[in-house]
Amino acid sequence: MGRDAFKPKHASSVSISEVIDTGVNSNLLRTVGCSRVRADCFYKGVFIMNYIGIDIGSTCAKTVVLNEKKEIIQEFVQPTGWSSVDTAEEILQKLKLAGINLSDDPSCCVATGYGRISVPYADKAVTEITCHALGAVHLFHQPDLTVIDIGGQDTKIIQIEQGFVKDFIMNDKCAAGTGRFLEVMANTLSLRPNEMFELARLGSDTTISSMCTVFAESEVIGLIGKGEPKENIAYAVVDSTIRKVAAQVSRMNGEMSTFCLTGGLCECEYIREALSKKLGKEVISSPDARYAGAIGAALSAMKIR
């Protein structure tokens, strides 16, 4: 999102009595707890709601605002930092700059992710499994999916049937196969993650046996010391992650439906291709797939009001 996305809309605030003449049901306003609301919440007498989903992960925080047609009207991502509470406050301020003031608007907000309990202004906190499933079904327009979410500190495999979570596996006790693992390995190679992925396309014939981030880093350092070409080491790092994810998928019961990739790596074409090859089935993705959890949270907000 560019800087212009957060320019104030200069929306004025009006009282309930001032908007009754527009044809808006005043009882509806009182039901959602509004004494004063933004004037641009109304268009030709039609009451407009914003539905906000906030997904505070261990590495990044994603925010999505949906309108009543379930269309994305705002989305932004930022580093979580060391304090989820501070991140939640920063998100609140960004929403205000985007013209969405939760203290005045008849909006509904749901938080999810690692830091979901750190969002004091959220109407509800919902688990990330539920939100990622809702978001994926909405993004890919398919009721049957197997979601592969590679996050900063964990990897989730979620099996969805007819729009509902059937089963899931979550690797949250070890950073192996996660975004953090890849980040550490890229730093060891003095590369940015995207540079490492592109370099990995050129490599082959090298493996990293350890699934532990600490031991894997030692292996990488050892390979560097032996003069192994950097592209081969990059290949080994990515291959290690792909094998870890595939092992998680193999633990799921039943036949796997369409695979979709969500999380921060959703736009990495090499990761998607490597997963497709390893799983023997195409893995689909979308540029908005990193917002799957936040989209699911916003959809959950629609069920509250």
Functional labels for PLM-detected ranges:
Residues Q74-T80, A98-T130, F140, K166:
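Short beta-strand-loop/turn "lid" adjacent to the catalytic site in phosphate-handling enzymes
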Residues A216-R251, R290:
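Adenine-nucleotide phosphate-binding core of ATP-dependent small-molecule kinases
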Residues S84, Q162-I208, C212, L299:
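Glycine-rich phosphate-binding loop plus the immediately following alpha-helix
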